[in-house]
Design a protein with these regions (language model features):
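HEAT/HEAT-like alpha-solenoid repeats
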Residues: 365-373, 403-414, 448-458, 488-499, ...
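Core helices of alpha-solenoid repeat scaffolds
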Residues: 105, 131, 183, 207, ...
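HEAT/armadillo-like alpha-solenoid scaffolds in large eukaryotic assembly and transport factors
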Residues: 154-157, 249, 270-271, 280-281, ...
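LRR N-terminal entry segment and analogous cap-like coil->beta motifs
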Residues: 22-170, 179, 184-192, 211, ...
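Concave beta-strand-loop units of leucine-rich repeat
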Residues: 88-94, 112-118, 139-145, 158-169, ...
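A structural signal for leucine-rich repeat
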Residues: 101-106, 124-131, 148-183, 201-209, ...
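Alpha-helical solenoid repeats of the armadillo/HEAT superfamily
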Residues: 135, 181-187, 204-211, 227-234, ...
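N-terminal "cap/leader" segments of large eukaryotic alpha-helical scaffolds
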Residues: 2-9, 13-27, 330-331, 337-402
């Protein structure tokens, strides 16, 4: 049997690492002084394990809301005699100055800090601790690291754990003392988003051996300084850097470049125009190029071969057949060519193995893959194009598409535009058309990122997209591994008194499905979250608006499901004015048959609880139930459910009947008449989880009419395997099999 998309299991190393991180005190750590987490003295962890621990820890912190961060986690790696760190990747505001200071004694080779806006210039001081070993450094999006906190001087304080972390907004004093002097082994440097106040040329001057430099979104005052690496630099990224003829002239002198990125975001104003002459110069002078990105540039003159002159046949990557004139000078096809947001991506023959653009699915997926980490503004647009492909056409690379969207949503949990487009794309990529090709593990990943989005954003579009995506899953089965979390999020959506109507409808539908066909433990847990009160609040609001819509009906249906054989939830229903709302709904919506059925089904659950039945035994309620026995609404459903409520009440005997009117005998007579009027072969819209509440009414003589109702119910519900008198929606385990036709009571 072929494996489904995304079915590759995690490695044993990954599984063990995650387990240890979730159970630190039971595995490698103990609780020390002042509850500080300490590494056990008999443990030594090599770099392969330490790197994995830190990097997976960051992933769990950012993507798993059930994971509890440890305040002193990074202190576990403070002593290189017991732990060895070499390659660390940290991101987002979660990372603080004290975390870097904790690992300052480690011989780091690679340190990637991305969007770490809680870091101040204290961390620049810490960086100098790694200067003798660091080979690769990324400070992308860490603009606050170049500012002091409130103008305080640089410090690398042993007691920094107790120092109050100030907000980034308070950082105003630019740090001028930091220098890359002594970082002699540094080869790869990413300074994307460097503040305009920092002079890149001065900062970079001490670094003589760089082979890779990223200056995305950096304002360059001059360009000549780049030539100091002309014999070494293999990769240069100048995304969203203001290009000029001077800068291009400098770039083409860097003859050893293998990767050049001079792309831009099209919505960013630029005076520079890409010409055929400039593109030709880049190709002819930089003969070692294997990767080039010119995305977002408007071509000033025509760079493409006229259609009637294009080489015949299928699309080719051979440079000699290139539909783009300058690329005909290439010695070999490029490994990567960025043409996103340019007209060049639409030509027939492009001499590159991997192309970003918007022409087809492959180009769009390449764009998402290339731009997700550092260019969410481009990834957002590419995901939007993938959304159109999945919605209108057909996604042929399903696994890759899902994995890329999931990665984008994880990477940019706090980017609203990514969350909106990503959740919309997931809705179409997980629908029925693609479902059979997806593994359990892949679909669980989708659920996780969808719930992350719901948790982070209360914005209408994100919430709607996430709720709609959840509707593509089998409920409750596929959501059970996140059962508590998804219920909490849905109830939070339904809390506001005024809410988007479509979100309300979807969220209530999901709530209803989640409490249907689950065990009592789950129902009780959800009840304690405020499920019953939330549904009743929705009903109250609809009553005020005098509107009986799907939200109203789904809310009563959800209450019917959550109170099934759960006395605590039934008690909550009564405590929260449930009976008053029942009477108001009956009066306000006398012709809503589905509504009546759901309400009476719920009250049947309440009536099954002996301790609660006295609260139903009032003249007003008994009169209402008795009158509903005559109802022909929804077939026999309303009459049947009303009779069920009364059957349980009658089961308590005449001594419990303390009222004079209506008389017990009169009500019992009406019950007999109602049962006799029902067609025993009626198809019922009901699904009992067990027969126990019905069977409880049989072995007694206090209330024969209750026995009669229970007997009729069982006979109507079972499937006779001989004559097929009735049908039902019960599991096959509830079908009664008779050994011979002579024993069948239907014959």
């Amino acid at each position: 049997m072929a494996a489904k998309a995304g079915d590759n299991p995690d490695s044993l190393m990954t599984l063990a690492t995650v387990f240890c991180l979730r159970n630190l005190r039971k595995t490698m750590c103990y609780q020390g002084f002042r509850n500080k987490l300490c590494l056990r003295s008999d443990i030594f962890l090599p770099s392969e394990i330490c790197d994995k621990l830190v990097n997976i820890y960051m992933d769990l912190v950012l993507t798993d809301s059930n994971f509890e961060p440890e305040e002193s986690f990074f202190q576990l790696f403070s002593d290189p005699r017991s732990t060895r760190l070499t390659r660390v990747q940290l991101r987002e505001d979660f990372v603080r100055d004290r975390d870097l200071e904790a690992i300052r004694k480690q011989d780091l080779i690679e340190l990637h800090l991305t969007y770490c806006n809680s870091l101040s210039s204290r961390s620049l001081k810490t960086l100098t601790c790694f200067r003798e070993t660091l080979v690769s450094l990324c400070l992308f999006g860490c603009s606050h690291i170049f500012y002091r906190k409130g103008g305080a001087p640089l410090a690398c304080n042993e007691d920094s754990e107790d120092e109050d972390e100030e907000s980034p907004a308070s950082r105003q004093a630019l740090e001028t003392d930091f220098s890359f002097q002594g970082f002699n082994r540094l080869r790869l440097l990413n300074l994307g988003g460097l503040p305009d106040e920092v002079d890149a040329e001065t900062l970079l001057k001490p670094l003589k051996s760089l082979t890779s430099l990223d200056l995305s979104n950096v304002q360059l005052l001059g360009t000549a300084f780049l030539t100091q690496w002309k014999d070494r630099l293999a990769s240069l990224v100048l995304y969203n850097v203001d290009l000029s003829e001077e800068l291009v002239s400098t770039v083409v002198e860097l003859v050893n470049l293998r990767h050049l990125d001079i792309s831009r975001e099209t919505r960013r104003a630029s005076k520079f125009k890409m010409t055929r002459k400039i593109l030709t110069a880049i190709v002819q002078r930089l003969v070692n190029l294997v990767s080039l990105d010119i995305s977002g540039h408007i071509m000033l003159d025509n760079c493409t071969v006229p259609h009637f002159e294009e080489a015949m046949g299928r699309p080719s990557i051979e440079p000699c057949k290139s539909s783009i004139y300058p690329f005909q000078d290439l010695k070999r096809p490029l490994q990567f060519l960025g043409l996103y947001d340019t007209t060049l991506c639409n030509v027939t023959h492009i001499p590159a193995y991997k192309v970003t653009g918007s022409k087809n699915e492959d180009q769009v997926l390449n764009a998402i893959e290339a731009y997700t980490e550092f260019r969410p503004e481009l990834a957002h647009r590419a995901i939007n194009q993938l959304f159109d492909i999945a919605r209108i056409q057909h996604c042929s690379q399903l696994l890759r598409a899902l994995q890329l969207v999931i990665a984008a949503l994880k990477c940019h949990k706090y980017d609203k535009s990514i969350q909106v487009t990503g959740s919309a794309a997931l809705f179409y990529l997980t629908n029925t058309e693609y479902r059979s090709d997806q593994s359990v593990r892949l679909r669980r990943e989708v659920i996780q990122v969808v719930l992350n989005g719901m948790e982070q954003y209360q914005e209408v579009t994100v919430q709607r997209n996430c709720c709609l995506t959840l509707c593509n899953f089998s409920i409750p089965e596929e959501l059970e591994f996140q059962y508590s979390r998804v219920n909490q999020l849905l109830l939070k959506i339904l809390e506001p008194a005024r809410q988007d109507e479509s979100i309300q409808r979807i969220a209530v539908h999901l709530c209803n499905a989640l409490v249907c066909q689950v065990d009592n433990h789950h129902k009780e847990a959800v009840g304690k979250m405020g499920f019953v009160k939330t549904m009743l609040n929705l009903i109250q609001k609809k009553l005020q608006d005098r509107m009986c819509d799907q939200v109203m009906e789904f809310s009563w249906s959800a209450l019917w499901n959550i109170t099934d054989e759960t006395p605590d939830n039934c008690q909550m229903f009564l405590n929260c004015r449930g009976m008053s709302l029942f009477l108001e709904c009956l009066q306000e919506f006398p012709d809503k048959q589905e509504l009546h059925r759901n309400m009476l089904g719920l009250l049947g659950n309440v009536a099954e609880v002996k301790a609660l039945r006295p609260q139903l035994l009032t003249p007003q309620f008994i009169t209402v139930f008795s009158n509903l026995l005559d109802s022909k609404a929804d077939g026999i459903e309303v009459s049947y459910n009303a009779c069920g409520v009364l059957s349980h009440i009658m089961f308590d005997g005449p001594e419990a009947w303390m009222m004079e009117e209506p008389r017990r005998d009169t009500v019992m007579e009406k019950m007999w008449d109602a049962i006799q009027s029902w067609d025993v072969s009626s198809r019922r819209n009901i699904n009992y989880r067990s027969f126990e509440p019905i069977l409880r009414l049989l072995p007694q003589s206090i209330s024969p009419v209750s026995q009669h109702w229970a007997t009729w119910a069982l006979f109507n519900l079972v499937v006779c395997c001989w004559c097929g008198v009735t049908d039902c929606c019960l599991p096959r385990s509830c079908i009664i099999h008779y050994p011979t036709s002579e024993l069948c009571p239907c014959t």
